[in-house]
């Protein structure tokens, strides 16, 4: 779209009415979506109506359809479930029900529907849209509406958002609620692990997901489970023997617990359900292990939404309004979905069709195809799970040895990356060393060989088990080279923040002086600041955002109770404003000051005036985030003094510096998984590179592509040579020159009720669901 069009969009909603409803099973993050749709709708000048109790409210009408204003959706982003209620509705499946629904919508002049729900709810919406014309004719015949009304409201437009914890909708990488459900599952697994270890027990955990094994698959990956049952990949006949053998094996190698994860829809090769009680009895009879079953049930739907779900829902909600405004009678009903970290629009019925194809493939026992149709993120998770589950200590040794170290500040997920890298390295036949305390430890010779079981139980641990330091290699080059020679190290895997990247760059630049540095090197970016070039997401930043978000939720609660209070919260991140921006969106902050988005005293004045105006409404609290290095003069103390004196008599002010609690406790499911995948992919890349550069009995690597940063860029995993990244880096402020998340700031400002230039808004493209988009090239 051209820039001019978007400026027009500012009032393009004028005269339009949008109805929002949540339907089917609830999911965490639905409230954030309702909030975003409502505010974006009001922002573009449309009238917005909240439809209570899903389709039931639509059919019954009356008090169930209420106009919304900006404040109707205040302070709901942190609540689980849906404040407008949801119901599974029989009446809407009949033509009479839909006729009543059409009549109720016309009473309010609503011809735009935003439906947040699962595939059933969205299919229902599409049927409704297709029948709209004939429903109006019928209403005219019955004399309920006039001919002119029917002409004015001749078309119904629909935008769908997929809200379902099962992540069973094809075409979107993540559905609203999935990440939060994984949070609940991991909290339970962490809690169960401690009791299982005390008693040497086996636990069989049953997770939800109907006919989709996504939750089971990802929680098995993120918890290092011993065995997994999912409907898309039933076990081979005779699996009972294999499973018991595997469980016995892990026990004999010193493990004190076994975890078996089973999806509620799990079946065997012949379509017969596998129940958790059957698995339990099997383990007890064959192995005599003390075994317990835990069925997680509706716990998974509950609790506060994770940061990912809040941001995903907010982004999708805004995009849904744009889709409604841009729709014409000829455009198909669309679903707003996520692909990588980009939002896209997909034709609703194409997605529903592929979702049905999965079920059909499973019914017809074409299981490989079912996994492929689930999409690339599912297929990739499955491949990595199989790889890790079937890995064994290699019988044949390769000639290669490599070292793994952590550099920079601790970040959640580092240990998960170390664990999977160590095990992948050992199963490739390499000798793997771990180095304590970063480059300094390498210089002092704190190097030890590591075995398969030395990294057991590391997945869910926060911080860095290897110990980490910020020291760069330059001052210790002689000693480092000496130790690389002593231990005959052919490759380095460096897991850490900006220092890890800068350190490897220094080693590469010293290759001319020291032949020992002509080895393969790979950096896995791991820092809460998300400031490493070569990747969109660093390991640990998801955990940090969630930690900061939980703190801000509590601070907001305190401000709500006190009335007329503004909190100024300082986040970490160095010069990089990622943490402040993303946390700001997740907690509905009024402003977030960051270094990348320069601001002056006029902006601060505007913010204070905006806050004063806000205090005249029913929302008498404010939350302002400030990145620690966003401005050398406008410090947290300065902002506190400014807000306090300008707001005297209207509001009072308090500050909070979050500090190191942002490094997080246990890693979030995203970071455990991301760490595990990066560890595997980096190690496989290192192995391949070592074979490429092995000549005449020695390793000699001096090409630029022998030292890379691995990262997720848009939709693919990419390896970027550190020498090429050098020109993309601002070394003075320790961050990349280009940052993708800056366009999220528009969303932050708009949702906080500021005028924004729509010229900068990037709307999602309409794509199609094809086998190609579902295939996995390099996806995650």
Curated annotation (Swiss-Prot):
Homo- and heterotetramers. Phosphofructokinase (PFK) enzyme functions as a tetramer composed of different combinations of 3 types of subunits, called PFKM (M), PFKL (L) and PFKP (P). The composition of the PFK tetramer differs according to the tissue type it is present in. The kinetic and regulatory properties of the tetrameric enzyme are dependent on the subunit composition, hence can vary across tissues. The modification Phosphoserine is found at residues 377, 775. One of its GO terms (cellular component) is cytosol. Beta-D-fructose 2,6-bisphosphate binds at residues 470, 527-531, 565, 572-574, 628, 654, 660-663, 734. It comes from Mus musculus (Mouse). The active site is at residue 166. Catalyzes the phosphorylation of D-fructose 6-phosphate to fructose 1,6-bisphosphate by ATP, the first committing step of glycolysis. Negatively regulates the phagocyte oxidative burst in response to bacterial infection by controlling cellular NADPH biosynthesis and NADPH oxidase-derived reactive oxygen species. Upon macrophage activation, drives the metabolic switch toward glycolysis, thus preventing glucose turnover that produces NADPH via pentose phosphate pathway. The modification N-acetylalanine is found at residue 2. Allosterically activated by ADP, AMP, or fructose 2,6-bisphosphate, and allosterically inhibited by ATP or citrate. GlcNAcylation by OGT overcomes allosteric regulation. InterPro entries: 6-Pfructokinase_euk, ATP_PFK, PFK_vert-type, Phosphofructokinase_CS, Phosphofructokinase_dom, PKF_sf. PANTHER family: ATP-DEPENDENT 6-PHOSPHOFRUCTOKINASE, LIVER TYPE, PHOSPHOFRUCTOKINASE. This is ATP-dependent 6-phosphofructokinase, liver type. Pathway: Carbohydrate degradation; glycolysis; D-glyceraldehyde 3-phosphate and glycerone phosphate from D-glucose: step 3/4. Its EC number is 2.7.1.11. The modification Phosphotyrosine is found at residue 640. Keywords: Acetylation, Allosteric enzyme, ATP-binding, Cytoplasm, Glycolysis, Glycoprotein, Kinase, Magnesium, Metal-binding, Nucleotide-binding, Phosphoprotein, Transferase. Substrate binds at residues 164-166, 201, 208-210, 264, 292, 298-301. Residues 401-780 are annotated as: C-terminal regulatory PFK domain 2. Mg(2+) binds at residue 119. It comes from the Eukaryota. It is found in: Cytoplasm. It catalyses: beta-D-fructose 6-phosphate + ATP = beta-D-fructose 1,6-bisphosphate + ADP + H(+). ATP binds at residues 25, 88-89, 118-121.
